[in-house]
Amino acid sequence: DGAADAQLFAAQFGAPMSVYGGIIECSKPINAGPHTYVLRSALRSLDSWIRTGVPPASMPKLQNTADIMGYETDANGVALGGIRTPYVDVPLAVLSGYGQDGGSGFCGLFGTTLTFSAEQLDALYPTADDFLTKWNEATDAAVASGAILEIDAEAIKAAATQYEAMRSAS
């Protein structure tokens, strides 16, 4: 029914700071990037490779900084390179593997979500239609690259239609 996809999308507007019913408490909101879609595509590609011998499409590496201790980012703080999905290419937040400097010992595994301000979102997406156009184009590009499956693309696009309501609620 798409409810889970809508919850994943909504998490970018208010990512949780705890997981597993509060067993693990972190100092900052955890990375709300839905890795499920990329994982499903990777597993499908792995299965196909085993069955046919045809390797999956290769994905670009994250772009390291000169000292190789971090990653190059765009003007919004989003990492350059790596597997691209609409959650990365049409960001509502900076989804990062870094950033937990406190909380439970496992928090370092969860990364962080830094939600954009209303002003940042307005500059990136002047209208909801502008956001949806960019989101749908990025979703189609992710399918074309093999990063996500076509069946997941439908749900990802449907969840994004809630952008305006979620923006208003945040």
Language-model features, listed with the residues they occupy:
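C-terminal His-loop and adjacent cap/lid subdomain of alpha/beta-hydrolase
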Residues: D1-S170
